[in-house]
Amino acid sequence: MPFHHEKLIVYQRALEFATWSQDLMEGLKKKTSTRDHLERAGDSIALNIAEGNGKFSKKDRARFFQIAHGSALESAACLDLLVARRCCAGSAIGRGKSILEEIVRMLFTMLDQLGCRVAENASEYGERADQEEEAEAD
């Protein structure tokens, strides 16, 4: 009988990313700190989804899902760094970025359903920025 987290599509995508990123890293010629960080951040996505799904309180579940969300964004940044440092071609990371985008969307939805927003309200930010500009102009 599978564990509950194994039934989650987001968890399955996290495993898919871990497999994809492992294949990418094995093809890299040099070992870098970014490569090591990608492995840790990629693993963290699946691990935090699993742990969070096992928590009983919404607050605890949300905390682990937020960490998984952050790890997915970190993984995307690691891919960008590998390209920027010429460790791999930009065309080599497209599939990984696509998987990560899907994971981020799913985690955002899960957090939203738990009543936890992971982003500030854009209209409030825009209004505050406008108010600050007006105050500076005076």
What label would you give each PLM region?
Residues M1-D138:
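Amphipathic alpha-helical assembly/interaction segments
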